[in-house]
Amino acid sequence: CITEEKKKLITFKWIISVGLFVQPCDIDNILEIANANKLWVLDDAAQSFGSSYKNKISGNLCDISATSFFPAKPLGCYGDGGAFFTNNENYYKIAYSAHLHGMGSNKYEYDRIGMNGRIDTIQAAILIEKLKIFKSELIKRSELAEYYKRQFLDLGTNIKLPKVISGATS
């Protein structure tokens, strides 16, 4: 439990929006809150990859987005991995450096703490092939979701089913 005194000491810098079930967040409302409070937004598109919001593809809804290639995600490979998306050159340079152990502009100088963030070649090969069928997989998922929705509705139960938010595709 955070006391009122401790709340006054907390400084927020980020909002992390998380899309779920191949559905993006209502990013307009999130960006409005972020802009009003001078906060950055990181869109976690790991579960929403392949969806769209107001004709913008998930992974491209704000300045910084990320996705995961974990097998259970919409665009999964057979191991771990992920991707970072940005149109901001400064964010790109920081992320690029961080994924190469923090390497700076000189090969043997390190500007920050980093890690090895490169995906291995086997996972990359799997993703290249999966990208070729990704759209058809999304269509099949939507068809199956609609089928299950009809089946649950036909049961006449009080089960609450997920709805796609206004302006979004799933």
What is the predicted function of each stretch?
Residues 16, 43-76, 106-111:
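Conserved active-site segment immediately N-terminal to the catalytic lysine
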Residues 60-99, 103, 121-124:
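Active-site PLP attachment segment
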Residues 1-10, 14-18, 23-32, 36, ...:
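PLP-dependent aminotransferase class I/II
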Residues 22-25, 41, 77:
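Hydrophobic/aromatic residue at the end of a short beta strand that borders the catalytic acidic motif
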Residues 41-43, 86:
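Hydrophobic residues in well-ordered beta-strands that form the structural core
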